[in-house]
């Protein structure tokens, strides 16, 4: 093989392994999927499939006290019932604790993280944002949280739907927790390490997760890893302003009749499904969605009030 052919082969490998779209849906097993969950799942699925990309599923079982027995399996069965088939195997955060701890240990040993014993009450008294009290106090590991040194704050990021998102300086500068005092690993650390492990290229999720995005970008830079792009979908809220959520007892979507809920979710996401689509097979409904998907049609809002919950 000549030098040109070898270079071309290397280029092809690079293009197929490093630039291929990989998206994901990462629910927490705190209850069944509801209409708000379906919006996030469908939006991330259509964004991936419309680019012939991979769509992965990760179960974020990071907080056992909030989890409901059997919810993870129920979520997966619901995705299957809705035709939202994923690529590869499902990742479970409960099986990734070793990776999280290894990274924390590396940062602790390198001086990039430290133990903190400040209480929520103390932080509230200090103004609501952590002022770095324990950064140079060499606290013991016992009864301590672990915080990351934030020496280069992320003051803004660009969202693919909402444009530039500015982050308040007090929030951007805060040394944030990467392992809680009770020993549980923080969401921001886990989600970034998992997205890197799964080669995620873009995160499509609900707008309720806009705020922690700056911290997640900061973790990518701390890890010297290229950050993903972000697209935050509008949230479905009730007329009193509450987000549809498991905590607010949003009803589970119907596994036995997926097409009406899928069409409603497509409409919520700015698509215009034809009236005849309700009569089509599930696979044809999803294929219509893949063909019609365009992020330019997404409502540029962080919340949309539903007149009816699903």
Swiss-Prot record:
Binds 1 zinc ion per subunit. Pfam families: tRNA-synt_1c. GO terms for molecular function: ATP binding; glutamate-tRNA ligase activity; zinc ion binding. A motif ('KMSKS' region) lies at residues 243-247. Its EC number is 6.1.1.-. L-glutamate binds at residues 24-28, 60, 187, 205. The keyword Aminoacyl-tRNA synthetase applies. Zn(2+) binds at residues 116, 118, 130, 134. Keywords: Aminoacyl-tRNA synthetase, ATP-binding, Ligase, Metal-binding, Nucleotide-binding, Zinc. One of its GO terms (cellular component) is cytosol. Catalyzes the tRNA-independent activation of glutamate in presence of ATP and the subsequent transfer of glutamate onto a tRNA(Asp). Glutamate is transferred on the 2-amino-5-(4,5-dihydroxy-2-cyclopenten-1-yl) moiety of the queuosine in the wobble position of the QUC anticodon. Belongs to the class-I aminoacyl-tRNA synthetase family. GluQ subfamily. This is Glutamyl-Q tRNA(Asp) synthetase. The gene is gluQ.
């Amino acid at each position: 093989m000549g030098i040109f052919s070898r270079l071309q082969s290397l280029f092809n490998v690079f293009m197929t392994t490093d630039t291929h779209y990989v998206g994901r849906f990462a629910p927490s097993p705190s209850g069944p999927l509801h209409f708000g969950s379906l919006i996030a799942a469908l939006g991330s699925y259509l964004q991936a499939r419309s680019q012939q990309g991979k769509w992965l599923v990760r179960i974020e079982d990071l907080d056992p006290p909030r989890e409901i027995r059997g919810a993870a399996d129920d979520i997966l069965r619901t995705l299957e019932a809705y035709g939202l088939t994923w690529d590869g195997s499902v990742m479970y955060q409960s099986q990734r604790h070793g990776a999280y701890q290894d990274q924390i240990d590396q940062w602790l040993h390198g001086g990039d993280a430290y133990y903190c014993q400040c209480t929520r009450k103390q932080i509230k008294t200090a103004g609501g944002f952590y002022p770095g009290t324990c950064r140079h106090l060499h606290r013991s590991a016992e009864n301590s949280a672990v915080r990351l040194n934030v020496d280069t704050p992320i003051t803004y990021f660009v969202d693919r739907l909402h444009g530039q998102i500015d982050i308040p300086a007090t929030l951007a500068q805060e040394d944030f927790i990467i392992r809680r005092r009770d020993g549980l690993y923080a969401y921001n650390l886990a989600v970034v390490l998992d997205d890197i492990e799964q080669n995620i290229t873009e995160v499509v999720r609900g707008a309720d997760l806009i705020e922690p995005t700056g911290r997640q970008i900061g973790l990518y830079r701390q890890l010297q890893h290229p950050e993903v792009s972000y697209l935050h979908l509008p949230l479905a809220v009730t007329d009193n302003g509450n987000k549809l959520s498991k905590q607010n007892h949003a009803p589970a979507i119907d596994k036995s009749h997926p097409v009406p809920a899928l069409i409603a979710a497509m409409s919520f996401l700015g698509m215009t499904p034809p009236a005849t689509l309700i009569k089509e097979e599930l696979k044809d409904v999803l294929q219509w969605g893949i063909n019609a998907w365009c992020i330019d049609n997404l409502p540029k809002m962080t919340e949309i009030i539903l007149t009816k919950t699903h």
